[in-house]
């Protein structure tokens, strides 16, 4: 008899509600703390409200990971629902303890096989893993095959972000060293990416136009190497800017399927408003 597999992820995937419902993806929220008040991302605070509150806040917002107890509660519930296995997919362990908390909680549940999976990224890059795992679980694919597919996606996947300034990342402790200093220089648009699970500075580019062009050049190489079949443009509270770039990319690279996503509160805390990102992988 096939094992019954559930898929769990966290709120930083920013998956559309209909996708979560259709694919039965369980979501554990991270929280954002604004002026001493904690909000569960996606439940107590929408993305639009977050950016509005940040503008009015006295202090710089921070984020916090879900406690192991939240995972224990969910895993127990899934076990009661008859699941044998849980694949718990989370944002990079290099920027958050969420993955570790899921893994620790999983070890405490008797009679349930919890496989914690480190996406090594975040946002819709992480969401791609959750969607693939959930589609395969619903098709009754075995655990080994699902993990093997996730590993293939990980091998092909990449993500680059352009931010307006690096101060948020520096204050949030998510950027190595004194790299934030470059952001204060006139017109510098830093391009960031994930390297060894951390957010690091990839390149310093003079203008937004040049930064986006540089990311497009990297995508072009990935397409030639057969590593980019589906991509997401990710925006920081500027859907128009995101959609404009998505349409441009769609016409430039018709062989790739492009969709629009966003940086929600937790990731927005670190990247700031106006950030733009692009992530891609195989389907």
Curated annotation (Swiss-Prot):
Name of the protein in question = DegV domain-containing protein lin2658
Superkingdom is: Bacteria
Q: DegV domain location, by residue?
A: 5-282
Protein's UniProt keywords contain Cell wall biogenesis/degradation: no
Which parts of the sequence bind hexadecanoate?
A: 63, 96
Spell out the InterPro entries in the cross-references: DegV, DegV_C, DegV_domain_contain
What does this gene product do? May bind long-chain fatty acids, such as palmitate, and may play a role in lipid transport or fatty acid metabolism.
Per the UniProt entry, what species is this protein from, by scientific name?
A: Listeria innocua serovar 6a (strain ATCC BAA-680 / CLIP 11262)
**NCBIfam families, per the entry:** DegV (TIGR00762)
Q: Which PROSITE patterns match?
A: DEGV
Keyword field:
Lipid-binding
Molecular-function annotations in GO: lipid binding
């Amino acid at each position: 008899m096939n094992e019954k597999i559930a898929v769990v992820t966290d709120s930083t995937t920013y998956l559309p509600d209909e996708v979560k419902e259709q694919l039965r993806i369980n979501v554990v929220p991270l929280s954002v703390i604004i002026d001493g008040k904690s909000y569960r991302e996606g439940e107590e605070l929408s993305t639009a409200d977050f950016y509005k509150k940040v503008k009015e806040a006295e202090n710089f917002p921070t984020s916090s990971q879900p406690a192991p107890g939240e995972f224990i509660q969910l895993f127990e519930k899934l076990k009661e629902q008859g699941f044998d296995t849980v694949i718990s997919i989370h944002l990079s362990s290099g920027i958050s303890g969420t993955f570790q908390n899921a893994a620790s909680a999983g070890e405490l549940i008797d009679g349930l096989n919890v496989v914690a999976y480190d996406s090594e990224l975040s946002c819709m890059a992480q969401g791609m893993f959750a969607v693939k795992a959930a589609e395969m679980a619903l098709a009754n694919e075995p655990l080994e095959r699902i993990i093997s597919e996730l590993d293939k996606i990980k091998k092909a996947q990449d993500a680059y972000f352009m931010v307006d300034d690096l101060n948020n990342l520096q204050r949030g402790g998510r950027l190595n060293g004194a790299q934030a200093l470059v952001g204060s220089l006139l017109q510098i648009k830093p391009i960031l990416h994930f390297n060894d699970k951390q957010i690091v500075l990839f390149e310093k580019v003079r203008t937004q136009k040049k930064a986006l062009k540089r990311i497009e050049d990297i995508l072009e190489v990935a397409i030639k190497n057969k590593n980019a079949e589906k991509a997401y443009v990710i925006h920081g509270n500027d859907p128009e800017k995101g959609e404009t770039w998505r349409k441009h990319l769609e016409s430039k690279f018709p062989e790739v399927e492009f969709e629009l996503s966003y940086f929600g509160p937790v990731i927005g805390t670190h990247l700031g408003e106006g950030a733009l990102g692009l992530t891609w992988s195989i389907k």
